[in-house]
């Protein structure tokens, strides 16, 4: 395209709003196609013993990739196969236990229609999503989902806009309906998203990130305050646990306790840790979620917490550990 000048006063915002208005109308019309065929499609996908295989060419292929990704992350195992590659060997990835979803707005994609006889021969259920109920793909499908739109948002009527939005929304409707039918939970979602923020919050446990062994700051009850302070600075967690030879907790001493000692105006050189420690102390179990420990620490306004089985010290968790793990 040759260079053109921007028309004086051209309103980009108005052009954008017109697109939204057109696509809103098209989505409102889509409601009529959530019908018995939609139920049949969901049932085939729900009872599928294999995977949901999504196919599409061009823009429909891009929508198909997103659709497959949404299915896979919401409890419906799925993957995308390019129809052109399927015709040259990749169809071997599809089994009779699978369900195929084929996408084409015209319903006449030659790359897909060429595959239909093979899919039929293998008795693979075929769900077609098209904008034309009378198309070849719609007629060949076991279930046809219509995504017909009145007009594209593109003023030329050429670039797939409203039609791709309608197809994407139909895919979301399938995915969420199946999610609800399966009783899919946030914890299930986290299992397929371990690297995401939600995954870290719902999967990471205290014992995954707590300090253990030699990293635990601890002294005996007979230690001087000076020795306890040295332990605090060596382990750099802003606290030390007071425990016996069997790592049974007797108390805790934090940097906040140290400030209170100085406010007392006493000679710190003459004090033992037993004189100034806080008996007992807040502790959490090692198996709880890290986000639960975070909530406790925030509610109690503390930056570190003991990890214990009853009174038996197992580790220490600091707010910095939660930050590094991405829980905060």
Curated annotation (Swiss-Prot):
Organism: Escherichia coli O157:H7
Enzyme's top EC category: isomerase
Disulfide bond positions: none
Documented EC number(s): 5.3.1.13
The UniProt record lists the keyword Transcription regulation: no
Residues of the CBS domain: 210-268, 277-328
GO molecular function: arabinose-5-phosphate isomerase activity; carbohydrate derivative binding; metal ion binding
Annotated ranges, domain SIS: 42-184
Official protein name in the record: Arabinose 5-phosphate isomerase KdsD
Highest taxon, organism lineage: Bacteria
Chain residues that bind substrate: 75-76, 82, 88, 114-123, 148-150, 222, 275
Subunit structure: Homotetramer.
InterPro entries registered for this protein in UniProt: CBS_dom, CBS_dom_sf, GutQ/KpsF_isomerases, KdsD/KpsF-type, SIS_dom, SIS_dom_sf, SIS_Kpsf
Function: Involved in the biosynthesis of 3-deoxy-D-manno-octulosonate (KDO), a unique 8-carbon sugar component of lipopolysaccharides (LPSs). Catalyzes the reversible aldol-ketol isomerization between D-ribulose 5-phosphate (Ru5P) and D-arabinose 5-phosphate (A5P).
Keywords: Carbohydrate metabolism, CBS domain, Isomerase, Lipopolysaccharide biosynthesis, Metal-binding, Repeat, Zinc
Biological process annotations from GO: lipopolysaccharide biosynthetic process
Gene3D superfamilies linked: CBS-domain, Glucose-6-phosphate isomerase like protein, domain 1
């Amino acid at each position: 395209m040759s260079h053109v000048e921007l028309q004086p006063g051209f309103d980009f915002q108005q052009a954008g709003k017109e697109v939204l208005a057109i696509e809103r109308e098209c989505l409102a019309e889509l409601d009529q196609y959530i019908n018995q065929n939609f139920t049949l499609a969901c049932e085939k996908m729900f009872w599928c013993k294999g995977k949901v295989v999504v196919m599409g060419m061009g823009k429909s292929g891009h929508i198909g990739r997103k659709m497959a990704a949404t299915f896979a992350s919401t409890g419906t195992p799925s993957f995308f196969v390019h129809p052109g590659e399927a015709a040259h060997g990749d169809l071997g990835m599809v089994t009779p236990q699978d369900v195929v979803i084929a996408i084409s707005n015209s319903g006449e994609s030659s790359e897909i229609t060429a595959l239909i006889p093979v899919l039929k021969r293998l008795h693979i259920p075929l769900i077609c999503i098209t904008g034309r109920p009378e198309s070849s793909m719609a007629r060949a499908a076991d279930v046809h989902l219509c995504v017909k739109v009145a007009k594209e948002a593109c003023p030329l009527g050429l670039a797939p806009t409203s039609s791709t939005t309608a197809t994407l929304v139909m895919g979301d409707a399938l995915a969420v309906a199946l999610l609800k039918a399966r009783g899919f939970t946030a914890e299930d979602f986290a299992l397929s998203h371990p690297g995401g923020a939600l995954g870290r919050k719902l999967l990471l446990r205290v014992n995954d990130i707590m300090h253990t062994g030699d990293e635990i700051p601890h002294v005996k009850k007979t230690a001087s305050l000076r020795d306890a302070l040295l332990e605090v600075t060596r382990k750099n967690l802003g606290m030390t646990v007071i425990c016996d030879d069997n790592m049974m907790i007797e108390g805790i001493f934090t940097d906040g306790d140290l400030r209170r000692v100085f406010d007392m105006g006493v000679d710190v050189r003459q004090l033992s840790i037993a004189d100034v420690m806080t008996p007992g102390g807040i502790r959490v179990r090692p198996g709880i979620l890290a986000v639960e420990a975070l909530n406790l620490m925030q509610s109690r306004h503390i930056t570190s917490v003991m990890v214990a089985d009853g009174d038996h010290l197992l580790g220490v968790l600091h707010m910095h550990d939660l930050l590094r793990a991405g829980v905060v």
